Design a protein with these regions (language model features):
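Cytochrome P450 catalytic-domain "roof"
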Residues: 128-135
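Short, conserved catalytic-motif segment at the N-terminal edge
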Residues: 1-49, 71, 127
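Amphipathic alpha-helical interface segments
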Residues: 118-121, 142
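Active/ligand-binding-proximal structured segments within catalytic/core domains
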Residues: 57
């Protein structure tokens, strides 16, 4: 099935591993790391985990809450003052984390390459009106939540999400995960 997906389904490259009690039972990998099929996929290929990163970032947030550095009931602007711009002053941390902040997109067009310009993107978000009132409805923030929560973490700790990941999770748990 793994080989079939690589050959017939259009999957460019993939890997799959099963561990039990710290022992590798299955370790499959194949295909290519790029659509041009110039770089082979190997057992050490790092992949984008996309939405899975939300759970990892949530663990960082939970750790900050546990350390009394972040409070779900406080306003986001208590940590990130610029976030209060354009009618967002009363939005709580819990509202942001639960995709109820009305900040699920950008009001001005942005380019894919802008995603690599952290300060630019979070400034855009801080200086735009929300799409709806806080807690009015849940609307998934697929493209913006990483920037919004990431900037909140950065304001609380003075460190990037990636640095927090390394210090709070990777080091103590002896894991390998990268964000940023």
């Amino acid at each position: 099935l793994f080989k079939k997906n690589l050959e017939n389904v259009g999957v460019v490259g993939a890997s799959f591993a099963v561990y039990q009690n710290g022992k590798v039972l299955v370790n499959l990998y194949g295909g290519f790391r790029d659509r041009d099929k110039k770089n082979k996929w190997d057992q050490n290929t790092i992949v984008n985990i996309h939405s899975t990163s939300k759970g990892i970032v949530a663990m960082i947030v939970a750790k900050l809450i546990d350390e009394n550095k972040l409070d779900l009931e406080k306003n986001v602007a208590d940590y990130w003052p610029e976030f209060a711009n354009c009618g967002k002053e009363g939005r709580k941390v819990k509202t942001l984390l639960s995709h109820q902040a009305g900040m699920y997109g950008w009001r001005q067009p942005i380019d894919e390459t802008d995603f690599y310009k952290w300060d630019y993107v979070v400034d855009l978000l801080a200086n735009q009106e929300p799409y709806h009132k806080a807690d009015e409805k849940i609307c998934y923030h697929p493209k913006t939540i990483g920037f919004l929560v990431g900037e909140l973490i950065k304001r609380v700790t003075n460190k990037s999400v990636g640095k927090n990941l390394e210090e709070l999770l990777n080091s103590p748990l002896e894991t390998k995960c990268f964000i940023g």
